[in-house]
A protein has these predicted regions:
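A short, hydrophobic beta-strand/beta-hairpin element that forms part of a small beta-sheet core
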Residues: 799-820
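Short, internal strand/loop/helix patches
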Residues: 768-802
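Short Pro-Gly-centered beta-turn/loop motif in secreted/extracellular proteins
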Residues: 311-325, 329-331, 340-343, 632-657, ...
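Short, acidic Ser/Thr/Gly-rich low-complexity loop/linker segments typical of extracellular
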Residues: 295-317, 620-638
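Secondary-structure boundary elements
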Residues: 3-160, 388-544, 554
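Short active-site neighborhood of thiol/selenol oxidoreductases, capturing the structured segment around
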Residues: 710-738, 751-754
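A short, amphipathic beta-strand motif
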Residues: 270-281, 595-605
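Hydrophobic/aromatic-rich core segments of domains that either
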Residues: 2, 116, 120-136, 145-156, ...
Length: 833
């Protein structure tokens, strides 16, 4: 007779050890946790201990035991009832089925609920089949919607029915884990071919990882709209919170979180070697090497490593350009070096450190060009659904869309309604009632979809005594407002109030800067026990006596507001400020901005910060971009007050093929100095802008409904495909540009293909006028339900913006594409033809 399985037999010892360490460090918090664990079964208690052992301190402070109990009980039930789950390697089960956190989202109970909703749909399925089915359920419940940076909990995404890609993937991972399918979120932290990033989901089955698009179901695994885009990435990573690291290349840490390199599953890769030498030309051991891509006109890190005893660091990456920097501190002095490397052509590079204060010594201040190459389109995942699978998937997705749209139609958060509709029973509550809509109004759209009435009630009740002491706008925004940054909205005012005596409260009101002194004494930072982007709430900081620097700054604002002092984090640099004599003053003395940089725009370029230019300061061996606010050029001039030091200006021109023409300007500015620099954007030649992208076959229809292959339409020479949205300004604009150059376009009319939804579109004024002037243009029809998205994604332009214009040269070979409103597209098309 086989011995009964023992839950987490291989990891039991280290779980207990790590749990005890956490409890030792935070005894006040863990005492009630230990009491509640005594009431759990042995398996559930051990599962809870695993969660507590490897969660960030912020989770320990922010959430009650009952939240994690939901995850533990569901995980144990899956292990007991599902043989597939019980057969998983323990590390896979712990990290990717049991664990509560996916990335930086708010944590809320969801697993038991999701399992109840999904369980019957996957009865008898293996992990592969279950993953595909769960993703259809996810599509029925949520879809993409651009929102702010705060990451919703999985249950909030489910309730409101949408989220950005990071939230969709958090939701999908939780849904998969709820029914025992091992799952994780993976990220392209920054694309190389466009200014953006993306997150999706991987599932583990048959001993391997496979991927899928969150809430974007397909009939097969390893298929998503991002398949081609991911082949052009320089890095794709996953993360693990456990200290026992699975196999894989570690590419950096974020506090307690380890980042793993997953790129080989998506792109053609190679290993590169960086050698760092000190000022004497000797190997620099333990130098920090940052691998960066140019994105949003700044160098953004995608991986970080330390050099070995030979001064070398190695990275597996894609075939494109990386900006590589190295830094090292010796005897209190920082040293720095940087270069740009094209990994397609180079295997190795060498960096020689110099003191950062001498970074610009001996260099003339002038623009230096840098060519940044995106990896070529080279998908390694080429599986495609059969026509039958595709038809089945389209039908199921259409049904999912109908279900979701019915679900979210007219949906609103009932907690908001409950808060607004609370009965006013006493005269003094009438004042509070007048501020209910003001409180909701100061919250973000996202806040209003997941806020809780009881939380808002406490903030309202305990702030009302101060309402007559300042202007209403100030009171609402900087005292009543429960939101400080991107923290989880929770109660904290009552807990803060009882923490101080009446005399202490008055002393802090009289001198709010003393609040920070108290915080610095009482709250310690343990970055090695945190995830930098996960904030400890004000109440969590007080409970655990720990918090990151950002968490402590949020606590300052929370205490000030609780005491009736208007306070905020400065929207540009997140510095703490409180109101004094009608204006905000800083809590910490800022470094004096004792220099002036005068930037000249020139005549031809419209400069947009973090689109085609940025400026960064070199400090502690690292360039950090300045967070400019609404500063605009006036009469082609921008005056920037700066601190003295070394700076780097970047300008970038993103080409249609994904490459970038960059310009760098390094300079030093001294105290009291005024320096003038003219921004310069590098121009591109036509041949630099083109690509050769193989487009998938697709069908268009003639007026009588006959289907025509796109391969036949594009077979000979160059063609212009134009998917038009009649009577909308972007389409009207390109049609007008073509008519303004009627004679030039007439010579190519037979090579121009207009695609519209219906014959009625041809009768609209501008389109009918264009067809009358350019008589030989070909007309075809499509419903725009699928082809637009497929072609837009394939050509790396926004598929949600029309018109979609593609220039081909040969059968299904796309050489140029654009979408939406773009001035000068007509001229570009003529150049290309």
């Amino acid at each position: 007779m086989a011995e009964p399985r023992v839950f987490l037999k291989e990891n039991r010892g280290r779980i207990e050890e790590n749990y005890l360490e956490q409890a030792k460090n935070l005894p006040r918090v863990f005492a009630p946790v230990d009491e509640k664990l005594q009431k759990c079964t042995e398996e559930v208690a051990l599962a809870c201990k695993y969660l507590y052992a490897f969660m960030p301190y912020s989770d320990i402070g922010n959430y009650p035991f009952e939240v994690f109990l939901d995850y533990a009980e569901n995980g144990v039930r899956l292990w007991k009832e599902n043989p597939q789950v019980a057969d998983l390697p323990e590390e896979i089960f712990l990290n990717y089925v049991l664990f509560h956190r996916v990335n930086e989202e708010e944590i809320a109970q969801c697993r038991t609920y999701f399992r109840a909703e999904i369980g019957s749909r996957i009865q008898g399925m293996n992990f592969r089949e279950a993953a595909l089915e769960v993703n259809y359920w996810c599509a029925e419940e949520a879809t993409y919607h651009c929102t702010d940076d705060r990451t919703l909990s999985a249950i909030s995404v489910y309730r409101r029915g949408n989220g950005r890609c990071g939230e969709e993937s958090v939701f999908t991972v939780n849904a998969l884990r709820s029914v025992g399918v091992p799952a994780r979120q993976v990220y392209a932290p920054k694309w190389s071919h466009c200014d953006d990033n993306h997150a999706w989901v991987e599932i583990w089955c048959d001993g391997k990882w496979y991927f899928l698009g969150a809430c974007e179901p397909e009939e097969i695994l390893n298929k998503g709209w991002f398949t081609n885009a991911s082949s052009r990435a320089m890095m794709i990573h996953s993360r693990v919170f456990d200290t026992k690291i699975p196999e894989g290349e570690v590419i950096g840490t974020d506090g307690m979180v380890t980042m793993l390199n997953e790129l080989k599953r998506y792109a053609v890769t190679k290993e590169i070697t960086v050698t760092v030498k000190d000022t004497q030309g000797l190997p620099a051991e333990e130098a920090e090497v940052s691998f960066e891509v140019l994105n949003y006109s700044e160098y953004a890190p995608i991986a970080e490593k330390k050099t070995d005893s030979k001064g070398t660091a190695r990275l597996t990456t894609g075939l494109g350009s990386l900006h590589i920097s190295a830094r090292m501190c010796s005897d209190g002095e920082w040293f720095y070096a940087e270069t740009v490397m094209n990994t397609e052509k180079e295997d190795n590079c060498e960096l020689c450190l110099v003191p950062q204060d001498k970074r610009n010594d001996g260099e003339s201040e002038e623009w230096t060009a840098a060519d940044i190459f995106a990896p070529h389109d080279a998908p390694v995942n080429t599986d495609m659904p059969t026509p039958e699978q595709k038809a089945k998937g389209n039908k199921r997705l259409a049904a999912a869309n109908v279900h979701r749209e019915q679900k979210v139609r007219n949906w609103s958060n009932p907690e908001c309604e409950r808060f607004l509709e609370k009965k006013v029973n006493r005269i003094e509550e009438a004042i509070a009632a007048s501020y209910r809509e003001d409180l909701l109004g100061v919250l973000t759209e996202k806040d209003r979809t997941d806020c809780i009435s009881d939380v808002l009630e406490e903030h309202l009740e305990l702030s009302i005594p101060y309402h007559g002491m300042m202007k209403k706008d100030t009171f609402v925004s900087y005292v009543l407002n429960p939101r400080v940054d991107d923290e989880v909205l929770q109660k904290y005012r009552r807990e803060i109030k009882k923490h101080f005596s009446r005399a202490e409260k008055q002393e802090l009101r009289d001198d709010p800067s003393r609040i920070w002194n108290l915080i610095e004494k009482a709250i310690i930072s343990r970055p090695e026990k945190e995830r930098s982007s996960v904030i400890t709430t004000p109440a969590g900081c007080i409970r655990t006596c720990t918090g990151s620097f950002l968490s402590k700054k949020i606590l300052f604002v929370a205490i000030a507001r609780t005491l009736g002092v208007a306070a905020r984090l400065n929207p540009h640099d997140r510095s703490m400020e409180y109101m004094e004599n009608g204006r905000f003053v800083p809590v910490l003395a800022r470094t004096e901005k004792n220099c002036t940089l005068i930037l000249k725009a020139g005549e031809t370029v419209q400069w947009k910060y973090f689109q085609n230019w940025s400026i960064a300061k070199l400090e502690n061996g690292r360039y950090t971009s300045l967070k400019l606010g609404a500063e605009n050029f006036e009469d082609q001039i921008l005056n920037l007050p700066l601190e003295s030091g070394n700076y780097r200006i970047l300008t970038s021109n993103r080409l249609p093929n994904g490459n970038m023409f960059a310009n760098e300007y390094h300079f030093e500015i001294q105290p009291g100095e005024t320096k003038e620099i003219e921004l310069v954007l590098r121009e591109a030649d036509l041949e630099d802008m083109l690509e050769n992208i193989s487009m998938p076959e697709f069908m268009l229809k003639t007026e009588d409904g006959t289907e025509v292959k796109a391969s036949d339409l594009t077979a000979d020479g160059k063609h212009i495909l134009m998917f038009l949205e009649e009577e909308k300004e972007p389409t009207e604009h390109i049609l007008n540009e073509m008519m303004e150059q009627e004679e030039a376009f007439a010579g190519y009319a037979e090579q121009i293909i207009f695609v519209v939804r219906s014959k009625e579109a041809l009768e609209t004024p501008t389109l009918s006028k264009a067809l009358a002037k350019l008589k030989n243009i070909q007309i075809y029809y499509d419903d725009f339900s699928e082809i637009i998205n497929t072609l837009g994604r394939r050509m790396y332009v926004d598929p949600d913006k029309l018109p979609l214009i593609i220039v081909t040269n040969g059968t299904l070979n796309g050489i140029y594409a654009t979408s939406g409103y773009n001035v000068g597209t007509g001229d570009m098309l003529l150049r290309l033809m």
